[in-house]
Structures are given as structure tokens and as C-alpha cells.
Amino acid sequence: LVLRSGDLHITTSGALNYKLPLVDLAKIDFSSENLTYLSDLDPDSVTWTPFVGKPDPLAKALFGPRRDRSFSGGLLQLSKPGGRELEYRKGLAIQSRTQLVYRLTEQFQRFKATVGLDHRTRGRGNVDLVILGNRRELLRKTVTGLMEPFDFDLDISGIQRLTILVDYGKGKGIQDHLNLCNARITK
């Protein structure tokens, strides 16, 4: 890590270089041994329901959740004010109406992510994000393509069953590509 001219320059152990403007940095967390990305876990169940009709195998493959990539196949992207895009290497891309259920076999304390609709939706899309822990509601929020990305940090102490539901909002499934960027659970 090197701080130079208002930017944080990062070189990974694999020799990848990144430059991040400090205005985009909220905090740095070095607790990787206590951190698990949801995209590295297999959900206990995944249920995708189309707005019209019944799910078929081709549609499930097309609209099912993606790990560490967007629905267009590239990195996960969110929009910042002024049209600037932020890219993320870890996370989940989820189309409405999708429910993911994770069975947590270890004791985790926090569930954190940066959330928004994919930058490529160009301001369209409208979903309801619901997160449950042991069937108890932890978060419910409408997310639109016109919103800035937001972070959440949820207490999941004692939770064995974590459910993420991305439900249809007012747009009836059009451009409903929610990105849960850096979605992680920590001990």
C-alpha cells in the first residue's frame, strides 16, 4: 500500500496493481482469516422465479445468480455520482426474483456488503432486497437504478440460516440486476 497524490496505490501478492481515489475508500480491513465471501460458499438452496411463466433450464442458466461476475460476464460494477463506475472482483450478481439460502456452520458475527444495481442498467431496475437470519428480518430495502450504492453491516450473531431475497419491485423484472459487492461474513 502506498499513498500518493490523493490515491491509494495497491500491489497484491500476485503482482496486480490498483489505484483507488481516497474519496472512494471507506476503510481498510486486514482481517482475511476471519472473513468469508459469500461468493466462495455454496448456497444450501437457490430459487429463481420468472415474472411470467415457469422457470425452464435455459432461463435458469441465463438469470440465475452469478459469483464474482456480472450478468454481462465482466466485473461487478456500481455507479457513483457523475456516472463514475466502481468495479468489484468479489460478490454476487442476483436477478429478481431470486432467493439464496446459506447454512452457516460456523459462528459469524457480521454480514457486510456494498449494494446497488449494476452500472450497466443505466438507471433502470427496481428490486426489493430482503435479508433474513433464522427467518427473522434483518434488512428490507427497495433498491433502484437511480440510487447511489450503499453499504450495510448486519449483526448475524447466532444465525445458522442466512436468506437473501431479491424480489420484484415496480419494474417487473426489467434490468433488475442487483450486485452485492464484497458480500462477506466475518467472525
Predicted features along the sequence, with ranges:
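Gly-Asp-aromatic-enriched flexible segments
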Residues: 1, 5-7, 11-187
